[in-house]
Amino acid sequence: MRHYEVMVILDPSLDERTVGPSLENMLGVVKTEGGKIDKVDIWGRRRLAYEIRKQAEGIYAVIDLTASPATVNELDRQLGLNESVLRTKVLRHDK
């Protein structure tokens, strides 16, 4: 198991109150594969440096988790398939 930080930029048309529950649904693969979600930090709506899919803003969320590399690959794949996700970035923490 390794420590990861996942940054997700969501579509700004989503209601900010529903971002938390929808992230929990997206992160279900981590729990089913035996990983652990350490922290979910929702930064809220921010202006993007450049447009992504014709959007100038996005809702940022940062997730700290502990999981196997295969689980994180599957999470990144599923987030990429989700239409409400504009962009993801996965970083591995060395502790």
Curated annotation (Swiss-Prot):
One of its GO terms (molecular function) is structural constituent of ribosome. One of its GO terms (cellular component) is ribosome. It comes from the Bacteria. Transmembrane segments: none annotated. NCBIfam families: S6. PANTHER family: MITOCHONDRIAL 28S RIBOSOMAL PROTEIN S6, SMALL RIBOSOMAL SUBUNIT PROTEIN BS6M. This is Small ribosomal subunit protein bS6. It comes from Nocardia farcinica (strain IFM 10152). The gene is rpsF.
